[in-house]
Amino acid sequence: LDVSGNLEAGIPMCPPEGDAGTGMTATNSVKVRTGNVSAGTSVFAMVVLEKELKKVHPEIDLVTTPAGDLVGMVHCNNCTSDLNAWVNLFKEFMESMGMEVDMNRLFGVLYNKALEGDKDCGGLLAYNYFSGEHITGFEEGRPLFVRRPDDKFNLANFMRTHLYTSLGALKTGLDILFREEQVKLDVLLGHGGLFKTKGVGQKIMAAAAGVPVEVMETAGEGGAWGAALLASYRVWKEDGETL
């Protein structure tokens, strides 16, 4: 790894990892009845449990917080990939019109437009499966958008539909935790790309999960911020100081 020979033995290394333990740290959701959700190209929610689950659920992974408390995790392969593909289609249209595209502004305009849509998304229906989805039993991905001739097909409902479907598989797993297992959750902290546009992903997630969702200013950085915090704890913690 080190052809120069300058690295010394014993240097702390941060292993490449997703937003699991780092996400819990980034959002400070390591206490019982708190949770965090990382939403981007894939999505997962982690809920710190008060007690063990009644039975085994294939949809729920059991892990722990960095401090060792039991966590119920719902992980889904698909979240915003299909949504991002549609946003890129709008980007391509704008470029074809000779316009310069600011992607942050484009996402902001389209995401906020979704808040103007009908509660039932005007009858529009989408499935965001870019890849297989174990929670719902799909081995391969087939993104799909369908509508009836008399549905209310407009931009607001179109974007609202794709934002909601990005969390459809996640809701399937969360319903097992909240309804079957009666898990209690006071707050869910959001991080990842879905939450970069202020307020929109937060509202969609709250509706899907049925619990209050909060977003920190570092939401877009997610696991990277958590990794930095854990590294700081590793280097500068005092004797006996817990996470």
What are these regions (language model features)?
Residues 2-189, 194-243:
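Active-site core segments that coordinate phosphate-bearing ligands/cofactors
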